[in-house]
């Protein structure tokens, strides 16, 4: 804070400056401090430069002085305004403290009797739990109790209640395990009860949706009984058309089983006639796909999907019949050049995948007939065929 300018300071009027009786048009007054020498004067500009901090106190005007009485009054007003501001600030702070204290007082009002009772009960439970903990913790192992106490000591809040809660949870686990071990029934949970419940169907809702002229049946609560009744009704009304009494409306003709007609293979003339008929109705190919289809029918292209046995008409013989052909060499000599020749023939036929079993047998029979016709020549050469 700056020092106040005294209003009782002696002033010396100069010839160049007006007195205090000057009007409002006068400029800033000269103020002569006690320690200043005679003849030195501080104008308003000097005061504003060294002492003034607020522009509201003085109004600056060019090269004019203000009376000293006005300066003293304004400085007193400035000091009073600052003191008032301080007082106001202190009052505001005091008011804030009072409001906070009133809020605290309001929050700490005595609760209702019901709340007091609940608090007393909670306090009793908390007081009882640490007392009961050592008695109930006897069933627990000392290692678990020591671990629970270590955990409770490591936490910053209430350690005794934490320890009691941990021990209670451990005891609950032990009780459940004992109950399962002894074969006791598990506790019935609310979810299991809801899952086993059945929804009862009311007949009023359905009856309202039906027309009046329809017959209404009472629906029982048990669906199983309804299912049995409907099953019995179905059995009663189920009839067989062959068990009823005949009405003799239609004439009964004896059913004779006719022998299936054997389909004869088409003759060569029929096949040729079919080819000529197809050639008459055949039109030129419109695209490459039709040409490929025709070539597939003629055997020029493979059939799709690709089959290695396409066009191979077998008589349904097994695989071993194609390979083991030694049984067809009966009647041939068991040794000699003819036997050796026929073994080579059968070996080659067993490796031929293009001939059927019938064709292979016919091939062997042809050699049999050939050697039978040449028996005279074989006897002359000293070879026994039989």
UniProtKB/Swiss-Prot annotation:
<protein>
    <recommendedName>
        <fullName>Small ribosomal subunit protein mS31</fullName>
    </recommendedName>
</protein>
<dbReference type="GO" id="GO:0005730">
    <property type="term" value="C:nucleolus"/>
</dbReference>
<dbReference type="InterPro" id="IPR026299">
    <property type="entry name" value="MRP-S31"/>
</dbReference>
<comment type="similarity">
    <text>Belongs to the mitochondrion-specific ribosomal protein mS31 family.</text>
</comment>
<comment type="subunit">
    <text>Component of the mitochondrial ribosome small subunit (28S) which comprises a 12S rRNA and about 30 distinct proteins.</text>
</comment>
<keyword id="KW-0496">Mitochondrion</keyword>
<keyword id="KW-0809">Transit peptide</keyword>
<keyword id="KW-0687">Ribonucleoprotein</keyword>
<dbReference type="GO" id="GO:0019904">
    <property type="term" value="F:protein domain specific binding"/>
</dbReference>
<keyword id="KW-0689">Ribosomal protein</keyword>
<dbReference type="Pfam" id="PF15433">
    <property type="entry name" value="MRP-S31"/>
</dbReference>
<dbReference type="GO" id="GO:0005763">
    <property type="term" value="C:mitochondrial small ribosomal subunit"/>
</dbReference>
<dbReference type="GO" id="GO:0005743">
    <property type="term" value="C:mitochondrial inner membrane"/>
</dbReference>
<dbReference type="GO" id="GO:0003735">
    <property type="term" value="F:structural constituent of ribosome"/>
</dbReference>
